[in-house]
Amino acid sequence: MKTFSAKPAEVKRDWYVVDAEGKTLGRLSTEIARRLRGKHKPEYTPHVDTGDYIVVVNAEKVRVTGNKEQDKIYYKHTGYIGNMKSISLGKLRDRRPELIIETAVKGMLPKNPLGRAMFRKLKVYAGPSHQHQAQQPKPLEI
């Protein structure tokens, strides 16, 4: 019996919508990253993008435990000397809540061109509405 290897043209991708309201950030992000990679499918192949599309709604209502709302700091560097920017999770939730889930999931995906292709299949929205009704996403309970 030969080892099965999925071909990019033969991969069937489904659309799922996930409601992040009241869900813990890490547990939610782990399952989203797993589905973006395609590890939940029997035809998973490490070097082929076999994952599904994930639409996340209510990103502003995702839950974190402990004092992470004030203690967790996100850092970025602009590339200029002395321009290290930092923002707490609480302030980031007020400004761009979708970035919280995007950052968590991006850190769980491979750091290569395949990981970037997987990340492009993630669509995150702060509120309850999204613009992907035409794809008829199925609800996914995590």
From Swiss-Prot:
One of its GO terms (molecular function) is mRNA binding. The keyword Ribosomal protein applies. This protein is one of the early assembly proteins of the 50S ribosomal subunit, although it is not seen to bind rRNA by itself. It is important during the early stages of 50S assembly. Belongs to the universal ribosomal protein uL13 family. CDD domains: Ribosomal_L13. Disulfide bonds: none annotated. Keywords: Ribonucleoprotein, Ribosomal protein. This is Large ribosomal subunit protein uL13. It comes from Methylococcus capsulatus (strain ATCC 33009 / NCIMB 11132 / Bath).
